[in-house]
Each structure stands twice: as C-alpha cells, then as structure tokens.
Regions:
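Structural signature of the Rossmann-like NAD(P)-dependent dehydrogenase/reductase core
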Residues: 20-22, 76-79, 135, 166-168
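Residues at the N-terminus of a long alpha-helix
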Residues: 41, 47, 132-135, 160
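Catalytic helix-loop patch of NAD(P)-dependent Rossmann-fold dehydrogenases
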Residues: 3-7, 14, 18-19, 28-82, ...
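Alpha-helical segments that scaffold the active site and NAD(P)H-binding pocket
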Residues: 10-11, 64-65, 108, 112
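Residue(s) in the substrate-gating loop at a strand-loop-helix junction
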Residues: 25
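Alpha-helical substrate-binding/gating segment
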Residues: 83-86, 105-127, 134-164
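Structural/interface elements that position substrates and couple domains in central-metabolism enzymes
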Residues: 7, 168-169
C-alpha cells in the first residue's frame, strides 16, 4: 500500500496529473470514543487496530504532506465503511465463490438455503446486546461516490485542497 502510493504520486507529478481520489477506510478512526459516535469526518484519528488501518493512516498522511508541498495537488479521500453487494452485471462487487470474506454473503447464502444456519461471532461489544454494529455501503453507491468526487475536483467546487468524505450508513 505505501510504496505503491508513493510511486503513484511521483508518476502523477512527472506527468502533470494534479487530482487524486484515494480509497481509504473507516479503520483510520481506530476505536472511536463515545463522544465521537456516530463517526463523522471531524472525529479524531486514533491508533489503528490493524496493520491495514495503519497503512491507510500513513497513506492519508503522505497525501496531506504531498499536497502541502505541492499546491497544485488536489486530493479527495474517501473513507469506506464496509463495501457490500455487487452490481447486477457482476462487473463490480463481490462474487463469493468459496468462503466469503465478510458477513453479508453469509446472510444471503443462509437466506437462499446454501447454508443451514448463520453464525455471528462476538458478544462483548459495547452495545445493548453485546453484538457488533456495522456501517455498510453498497458498491454501486461507492462507484457513484468516486464519480462525484472526480466531478467535484474538476469543477473547482472543492472547499479544501484535501477533502475527506466518509462513505457508509
């Protein structure tokens, strides 16, 4: 994740490309404090809970540093909250052959009878029943958000040189 972003930014500079939409993650928020729930873009970045989250934090910092050094760089950072689903064409999104990597395919496989039961793990979350609460975004909405981010940069209506948007429910 890190070196590929640095290489991309170097190539953008070499070829005079000044706009980037970066796919980040809600994992940059770490474990949000209760006063910052629900999480919005003003919530502080906390210690990442995974190496993946840490790389996203570092990537965002690299983008901010590069924008500070190069005033022609315009960046939009999109922080995803659990992308789910697939486009009807199956060109984007999940097509879980084998063991899915997240909960929703298990839910749908159970609903149509491919699985006998649905097991949800974890009962010690800070919620009334101890279960996990998750935010999701449909992959088609995610694709539309990328288009909107590019349109916003190209139209000159961005409010800051680096803008951040959360994408979830």
């Amino acid at each position: 994740n890190l070196m590929s972003l640095v290489t991309l930014l170097e190539q953008m500079k070499a070829h005079k490309v000044h706009n980037i939409v970066f796919s980040s993650s809600c994992t940059v928020y770490g474990q949000p404090t209760p006063e910052h729930l629900p999480v919005d873009e003003t919530a502080p970045i906390q210690v990442a809970l995974s190496p993946y989250g840490n790389t996203k934090q570092i990537n965002e910092e690299i983008i901010r540093d590069e924008a500070h050094a190069d005033k022609s760089l315009q960046a939009t950072i999109l922080r995803y909250f659990n992308p789910i689903g697939a486009h009807p064409s199956a060109m984007i999104g999940e097509l879980p052959n084998g063991v899915p990597q997240n909960l929703l395919p298990f839910v749908t496989q159970t609903a149509i009878g491919l699985r006998k039961e649905l097991k949800v793990f974890g009962n010690d979350y800070n919620t009334p029943d101890g279960s996990c609460i998750r935010d999701y975004i449909y992959v088609v909405d995610l694709a539309k958000a990328h288009v909107k981010a590019v349109e916003r940069m190209l139209s000159g209506t961005a409010l800051d040189q680096v803008e951040v948007f959360n994408l979830g429910t």
